[in-house]
């Protein structure tokens, strides 16, 4: 899909009373089937090249996206907000998206930290009208420190979850992700991108491009959303 076929509407909404307004982008293909509320990762905002590329691939699959900034990123800081602010921002973003998406089926998630914060928000209190969660590289543990505690709250999430994980992701050992998904039962779907790292970058010797990996991920989101 070309940029001319994708409608991008810049918006602002109140993240929290304390933090004030943040920016958002509603990107809508000509005939969307659903909407993904899509949060950025810890180190880069909603217009990072990964976010832009993934939005384009999702649009090719008929999926509109509602991207937004967390307050710290809006303010130009590199240090993430305290967790209560991050979680409140997720709830505010979902509520705002629900008001502008014309009743389309709604999903939520994000890249790395954005997906994790979305899942924590859903575990604390259901996200109204959200049918499922999408994680682009769920950060299960710090690099080099395999652990599973960051996934414990997922047991309290009651809606379907799609995990998109790379085999070279140093923040999510597949030997830990797989049993976690098994514990979650039918709520969890795991798709593994062969050769991809945490940024879904693949080495040249893999024989494919980063763009092809993102296309693969978008197809998975599309097929999963139909069933959720």
Task: Kindly give the residue locations of the regions a language model identified.
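Primarily recognizes the serine-hydrolase "nucleophile elbow" in alpha/beta-hydrolase
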Residues: 90-159
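Conserved alpha/beta-hydrolase "acid-adjacent" motif
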Residues: 170-176
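Glycine-rich His-Gly loop
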Residues: 38-42, 112, 166
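Catalytic histidine neighborhood in serine/cysteine hydrolases
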Residues: 183-201
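Short beta-strand/loop motif that positions the catalytic acidic residue
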Residues: 156-158, 163-165, 169
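Serine-hydrolase catalytic machinery in alpha/beta-hydrolase-like enzymes
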Residues: 13-106, 200-210
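Catalytic active-site module of serine/aspartate enzymes centered on a nucleophile-bearing elbow/loop
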Residues: 204-228
């Amino acid at each position: 899909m070309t940029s001319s076929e994708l409608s991008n509407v810049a918006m602002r909404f109140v993240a929290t009373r304390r933090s004030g307004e943040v920016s958002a982008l509603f990107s809508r293909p000509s005939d969307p089937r659903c909407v993904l509320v899509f949060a950025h990762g810890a180190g880069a905002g909603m217009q990072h090249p990964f976010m832009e590329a993934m939005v384009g691939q999702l649009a090719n699959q008929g999926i509109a996206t509602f991207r937004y900034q967390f307050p710290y990123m809006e303010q130009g800081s590199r240090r993430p907000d305290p967790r209560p602010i991050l979680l409140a921002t997720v709830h505010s973003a979902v509520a705002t998206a629900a008001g502008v998406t014309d009743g389309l089926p709604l999903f939520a998630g994000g890249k790395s930290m954005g997906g994790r914060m979305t899942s924590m928000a859903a575990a604390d209190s259901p996200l109204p009208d959200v049918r499922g969660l999408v994680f682009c590289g769920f950060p299960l543990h710090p690099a080099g420190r395999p652990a599973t505690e960051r996934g414990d709250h997922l047991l309290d999430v009651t809606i379907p979850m799609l995990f998109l994980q790379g085999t070279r992701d140093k923040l999510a050992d597949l030997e830990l992700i797989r049993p976690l998904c098994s514990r979650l039962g039918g709520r969890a779907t795991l798709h593994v991108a062969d050769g991809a790292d945490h940024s879904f970058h693949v080495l040249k010797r893999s024989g494919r491009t980063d763009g092809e990996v993102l296309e693969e991920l978008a197809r998975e989101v599309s097929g999963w959303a139909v069933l959720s």
